Amino acid sequence: MEFDTIAAISTALGEGAIAIVRVSGDDAVEKVDRIFKGKDLTEVPSHTIHYGHIVDLDTNQVIEEVMVSIMRAPRTFTRENIVEINCHGGLVSVNKVLQLILAQGVRLAEPGEFTKRAFLNGRIDLSQAEAVMDLIRAKTDRAMNVAINQMEGRLSKLIGLLRQEILETLAHVEVNIDYPEYDDVEEMTHNILIEKATHVRSEIEKILETSKQGKILREGIATAIIGRPNVGKSSLLNSLVQEKKAIVTDIAGTTRDVIEEYVNVRGVPLKLIDTAGIRETEDVVERIGVERSKEMMSQADLVLVVVNYSEALTNEDEDLFRAVQGKDFIVIVNKTDLPQAIDMERVTELAAGNRVITTSLIEEQGIDELEKAIADLFFEGTIDSADMTYVSNARHIGLLTQAGKTIGDAVEAIENGVPIDMVQIDLTRTWEILGEITGDTVHESLIDQLFSQFCLGK
């Protein structure tokens, strides 16, 4: 495939030590060489870096002191010639360098266009391309490992093996239908077809079994911290985040809005939501906060219910316990540094088998136990993201679910005595659906939509 030459700033905008302008295309080296004062870039070997200056051709003025990396096709990310200009960090100089490159007939890249070219030029498939964005957005080491595994093609390999198995089955069916007189070809009986289709369905189900953990690693666990005013919700947020994000006072009702913060808890990404204290109030602003707290509680994957060790349970406390029944929740009995007034037996009863953890956040006690409880709740204490392939992308999960249902329909049809040639439709459709994950059978409009979500310069 031949494309025009594109360029974009690949580093985050703002002040920094280094900013990089990336250029990709057949004539990328020649275009940059026009404004580069130093070695002749068209003559240097691939995968080398060179010192020089960027010059404004109209004024012959030196604009930047740079290091230029030359990478020639096909051993590059896009499989095109790539030039990366390492400038001093800062908005003015790097933008000036970009403008000088564009003035040489280079087009400004669209968001994700470099990765899109890597896909279109066959260097990576669609699932690997999507993993690039997952890596950029990873919030924990485990999420990073999952993204790297997918970038290396582990999911692609699994999908490829399944598609190959379906294709071989379809070919076998075709031969049996079109050339029944061939004695040297094994007959495709209903039993053999059921065995092959069932195996594919089983493998799809195995991949889908990792989707819950994969989705958590990719998107995080939406975790609502709820409780009456002044029981220590904001203190809990600050303890987990390990810095002061929420205002903590002895005045009930200090938190009037929802505060969100991501935190890494033993490799598990939590999207922590500190909510306004839930109570009856005449204050209009606080009442709005209370309603939002209830909404966040209903949407959360995990609820941390905070109660006060130094106070007896109230009707409002018991209402909160009833509201979270049916959800994953952990009870935090805070302020154990104060004299006990709470009925712990009643707390255990209301927890209904969920973990109850005592803490004194002011004395930094109980946080380690809480973090372990969270990790145990979602991963049973273990998750081997380095060796396992986790499916985490919602698009992939949807397609795998659809493929599993379609191949399941094929199995059911065979068991009901439907002629083998009619089952070909479901088998072919399963093969096509799985191909949408890797991009082998995907529509161009979907490709454009997916890559538009990438950042500029990637």
From Swiss-Prot:
(6S)-5-formyl-5,6,7,8-tetrahydrofolate binds at residues 22, 84, 123, 458. PROSITE patterns: G_TRME. GO terms for cellular component: cytoplasm; cytosol. Keywords: Cytoplasm, GTP-binding, Hydrolase, Magnesium, Metal-binding, Nucleotide-binding, Potassium, tRNA processing. Its cofactor is K(+). Binds 1 potassium ion per subunit. It is found in: Cytoplasm. Pfam families: MMR_HSR1, MnmE_helical, TrmE_N. GO terms for biological process: tRNA methylation; tRNA wobble uridine modification. GO terms for molecular function: GTP binding; GTPase activity; metal ion binding. GTP binds at residues 230-235, 249-255, 274-277. InterPro entries: G_TrmE, GTP-bd, GTP-bd_TrmE_N, GTPase_MnmE, MnmE_dom2, MnmE_helical, P-loop_NTPase, Small_GTP-bd. Residues 220-379 form the TrmE-type G domain. K(+) binds at residues 230, 249, 251, 254. It is an enzyme of class 3 (hydrolase). Mg(2+) binds at residues 234, 255. Its EC number is 3.6.-.-. Belongs to the TRAFAC class TrmE-Era-EngA-EngB-Septin-like GTPase superfamily. TrmE GTPase family. Homodimer. Heterotetramer of two MnmE and two MnmG subunits. NCBIfam families: mnmE_trmE_thdF, PRK05291.1-3, small_GTP. Exhibits a very high intrinsic GTPase hydrolysis rate. Involved in the addition of a carboxymethylaminomethyl (cmnm) group at the wobble position (U34) of certain tRNAs, forming tRNA-cmnm(5)s(2)U34. This is tRNA modification GTPase MnmE. It comes from Bacillus cereus (strain ATCC 14579 / DSM 31 / CCUG 7414 / JCM 2152 / NBRC 15305 / NCIMB 9373 / NCTC 2599 / NRRL B-3711). The gene is mnmE.
